[in-house]
A protein has these predicted regions:
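Short beta-strand segments
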Residues: 36-38, 62, 94-96, 166-169
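Conserved beta-strand-loop surface patch within small alpha/beta domains used
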Residues: 18-76
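Ordered, amphipathic secondary-structure segments that act as subunit-interaction surfaces
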Residues: 84-96
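Structural motif
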Residues: 32-34, 58-59, 89-92, 164-165
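Divalent-metal-activated hydrolytic enzyme cores
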Residues: 2-31, 66-74, 84-86, 101-185
Length: 185
């Protein structure tokens, strides 16, 4: 029985044989926008198709719950890189309905970590971080609007960057507009 790693390497070999990527694509996004969205498995391929994004169009940042924790967390740093190095001109925040993060609590994940052998001493070090991150998140649409508010308040995000908020149905790909960033500029 092949392992998942072997399957992936075989798929890559077949991809290289059958798909000649001869066109050089710039690392600078052609449509000059960044997309922050969730890492949910149902969004793989779906979000690109639903938004009409093709290889080379955008900088895509994915994390659990389309999260933004702290003024200078990793997600913000990634967005700043897209603005100041890769010259993006717009940001799209796209959450999704039925988000697993909204159904998870710090208590749940800490319990699961404990059952997998993480010591109480180690859990105490991260408990507050998980409470701050997971416990307030109960509504994906509200989260998108909160992320936009935090980005607009961030002194390092230029005021001339429209920040749009949408939410996608992970089953159909239908987008609902939550905030039109053009109306804010």
């Amino acid at each position: 029985m092949a392992t998942l790693l072997q399957e992936i390497l075989t798929n890559n070999h077949e991809f290289l044989v059958n798909n000649k990527c001869t066109k050089e694509i710039s690392k600078y996004p052609q449509k000059k926008f960044a997309l922050l969205t969730c890492m949910d498995t149902r969004l793989v391929e779906l979000i690109n198709k639903a938004l009409g994004i093709h290889r080379g169009d955008a900088k895509i940042i994915q994390n659990a719950g389309t999260s933004l924790i702290g003024e200078m967390g990793e997600t913000v740093k990634s967005l700043l890189l897209t603005i100041y190095v890769f010259d993006i001109k717009e940001i799209f925040i796209v959450g999704h309905y039925d988000c697993g993060v909204a159904l998870t609590s710090s208590k749940d994940i800490l319990h699961n970590m404990r059952s997998r052998g993480v010591s109480e001493q180690q859990l105490k070090l991260i408990e507050k971080d998980f409470q701050v991150w997971l416990d307030p998140y109960t509504d994906p649409a509200k989260n998108v609007l909160t992320v936009i508010k935090k980005l607009k308040a961030n002194p390092f995000i230029p005021n001339d960057i429209p920040i749009h908020g949408l939410i996608i149905d992970p089953h159909t790909g239908k987008l609902d507009l939550l905030e039109d960033g053009y109306k804010e500029i």
